Amino acid sequence: MLVAGWSAGGNIAAVTCQLARDRGGPDIAGQLLVCPVTDCTFDRPSYNDNATGYFLTRSLMYWFWDLYCSPADRTDPRVSPLRGKVAGLPPAFVVTCEFDPLRDEGVAYAEAMAAAGVPVEHLRASGHFHSSFAMVDVVITGVPGRAQMAGALRRFAGLPEVSRGDESSKGHDSPEHRIAAAAS
């Protein structure tokens, strides 16, 4: 099983990995966390650097947190996974974007997992903002990053990498083949 999530979904994926480890399953082979929400604090530099102007704003994050849970519950690791135990988690591919209020908490989560011995790949997406990877036909600079994410999921699943010109990929029109072709 693999888990993946973007933003709040990244939070859910991270918490799912911690709960699966603590409860003895299910076995998770890898986690893809794209711009994940990992902590309830707003005092990291990226919250000031990217407070406005890049789709996801600091004030919008305040609003989301107020909808999600009470201030008293925010430090619970099931809400803020950065505050939980990160040792023993499955391999991770973490994406953070330069112009994202969540950048620094994503970096902190990737660094905490790596320090605890979790295999971590970290894509620091320069020039990207919180939702730019989802804008497939608009932000074409996201193609290589999306290909890296797909490659990580394939590795976690034990599948071979797909590359343009691979004889086995000729004549196929699956999404992973289109991603590989666009990225090369």
Regions found by a protein language model. Give the residues of each.
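Alpha/beta-hydrolase superfamily serine-hydrolase fold, recognizing
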Residues: 1-184
